[in-house]
């Protein structure tokens, strides 16, 4: 990793500066980031739409329900379930984007043929940490069981328990937020090699970075609030454009099936970029990257001064 060859300036930044920089990075590399994000998002988006399709028949569910006759409750159930799935799936779905961010920011030479090699090498650890422990795969299994059990389509207890589990997993993710970067970019192993007992492992690395993330928790709370606001804003803007262009001002199936999930994934893309920048900022604070660059610049300046001809 060459710290003197980066797409952004290596410097310690405040939380407001990181929020601003995340938007700048998206603006500058929008095409590339969107391409790599779609590779992971499309399979999950299609799977979510298929599994949640039984919950989208609001009128039918309200007619069959004995507890409520309002279809708005069932619409809320669908929207909330979709949001929970995207939240739990985002770290795994956006892993390709995380790799692209690392290669882009640090100007690494890579080809489109082998850019997924780090994920394939770490597939076991990624599946265990991001797929199982972070809740993406269990949430999909619960959703699939719900989709195959008609009685659960009208039961709000499943979504209540899924919400509680999602909150717990979100808190757990806040303790160790940089799992995608550690696994994909640093290629850290889950267990140490018997031949190298002192090698860095995933648990050691997360503990070490946890001590250095002074402002990460504050940024995490801000990110959650901004994500909710951004998703709502994107949906309202899309609804307004549809109303102006085609004269449809009602919240129809296209909002539930296309625009709302797209807004969620767009917000997930932004949070992935922000998390990566916080990760870089944490390493700058912990490893003194900015000091290393200053020492390199001073050494280069001294070398140029010593090599200059004596004009006296």
Where are the regions a protein language model picked out?
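Hydrophobic alpha-helical membrane segments
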Residues: 1-312
């Amino acid at each position: 990793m060459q710290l003197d060859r980066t797409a952004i300036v290596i410097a310690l930044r405040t939380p407001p500066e990181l929020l601003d920089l995340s938007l700048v990075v998206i603006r500058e590399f929008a095409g590339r980031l969107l391409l790599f994000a779609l590779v992971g998002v499309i399979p999950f988006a299609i799977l979510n739409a298929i599994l949640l399709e039984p919950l989208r028949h609001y009128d039918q569910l309200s007619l069959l329900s004995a507890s409520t006759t309002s279809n708005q409750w069932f619409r809320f159930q669908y929207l909330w379930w979709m949001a929970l799935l995207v939240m739990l799936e985002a770290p795994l779905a956006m892993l390709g984007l995380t790799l692209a961010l690392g290669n882009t920011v640090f100007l690494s030479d890579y080809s489109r043929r082998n850019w997924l090699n780090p994920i394939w090498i770490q597939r076991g650890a990624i599946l265990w940490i991001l797929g199982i422990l972070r809740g993406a795969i269990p949430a999909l299994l619960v959703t699939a069981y719900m989709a195959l059990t008609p009685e659960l389509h009208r039961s709000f207890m499943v979504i209540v328990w899924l919400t509680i589990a999602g909150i717990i997993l979100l808190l757990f993710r806040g303790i160790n937020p940089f799992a995608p970067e550690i696994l994909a970019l640093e290629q850290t192993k889950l267990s140490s090699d018997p031949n190298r007992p002192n090698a860095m492992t995933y648990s050691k690395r997360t503990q070490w970075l946890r001590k250095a993330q002074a402002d990460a928790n504050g940024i995490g709370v801000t990110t959650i609030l901004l994500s909710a606001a951004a998703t709502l804003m994107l949906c309202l803007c899309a609804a307004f454009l549809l109303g102006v262009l085609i004269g449809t001002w009602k919240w129809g199936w296209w909002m539930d099936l296309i625009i709302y999930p797209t807004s969620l994934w767009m917000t997930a893309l932004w949070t992935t970029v922000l998390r990566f920048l916080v990760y870089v900022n944490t390493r700058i604070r912990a490893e003194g990257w900015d000091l290393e660059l200053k020492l390199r610049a001073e050494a280069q300046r001294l070398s140029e001064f010593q090599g200059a001809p004596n004009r006296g």
